[in-house]
Amino acid sequence: QRPVRASGELHHVRTRLYLRVEHEDLWGYGEVSPQPFALNGDPGLDQVIDALRNALARLEQVTNREGELPHWSRVARLGAATARDNVAYALVEMALLDRELRRERVAISDLWIPRAVTPSLATVSLLDDDVPWSIHEGVARVRVKCAPGALTTTARERLRALAQPVLLDFNCSAQRDDEVLDVLAAVSKVAVVEAVEQPYGVGNVVDHARLALALGVDLSLDEGVRSVRDLAQIARYHAAAMVCVKTARVGGLANARTVIARAHELGLRVYLGGFFESPYARRVNRALANSCVSEPSDVSDVAVSALEEPTTIATSFGVEPSPRVLEDAATLTVL
């Protein structure tokens, strides 16, 4: 993956946390990719690791008390629903789901029946002319990282060459409506803009609602979507027409399905985020999306080296993390 610059950080290769949960000679793997430091309401890597240690201790307590691992769908309720707990328990949940599917010798498609093939979403940036854009064949929408300010000549040329509609992602970088409207107007001269994503800070539904009336295109919220309560506020204020759901941010796969279903009930268009995940987690995202998301999402294959390619298995998610990746990883906690 090429690095993609956003307004607050350089989106490059993040540290990926893998968790292997083994019990009674059966195991499963989870994966999350926290950002290096806390930003826009999301926890940093160190915070997630601290929360994970507590989550594993909690998992051990529950297992000792009940005599078996909790069902994967219960895991999210074991945490405190904080930003850091959401990511940590999402990691545990994925590992337990993988283990249960392996135990039952079934595939994820048996649990989440595919309804359609979810189109893919690519991510590029207007904030760094030195990094080439990489857009794979078949991409249906392009998320373009941006910030207030004028477009460079290179940025305009790249936008003009796009065949796909654009989603302008501000990553909470705007302060005023005119900053967003100026960028939208400039980009609209050379590309088709479908939506503007998260121009203002997390929780600021009032300013988003006002801006939505002036945009002329859909407004989407990403960092501001963490629970069904957030959806209720978004719908109440008419703050967005679209939402991006990220499984780790909302506390795992079970919560993600609940959030997606509620968003649809509220008439919101939903897409699944997950720019940083490895091919392993992308496979899980794809299974989730194919069962309940029709908007272009982060579900395409990720270009990695042969040593990083996941290993094919017959059940569960159809793959597991590459042995080489796990061998080279630093062990943080062993339960």
Segments predicted by a language model, with ranges:
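Structured beta-strand/loop patches that form or line metal/cofactor-binding pockets in enzymes
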Residues: 1-40, 307-310
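N-terminal amphipathic alpha-helix/helix-capping segment at the start of soluble metabolic enzymes
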Residues: 6-8, 12, 72, 76, ...
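Conserved, mostly hydrophobic/aromatic
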Residues: 19, 25, 92, 105, ...
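Metal- or metallocofactor-binding catalytic centers and their adjacent structured scaffolds
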Residues: 21-22, 27-104
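Residue-level marker for buried hydrophobic side chains located in beta-strands
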Residues: 28, 166-168, 219-220
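Metal-dependent enolase-superfamily TIM-barrel catalytic cores that perform enediolate-based chemistry
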Residues: 106-215
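Catalytic alpha/beta core domains of metabolic enzymes, predominantly
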Residues: 202-300
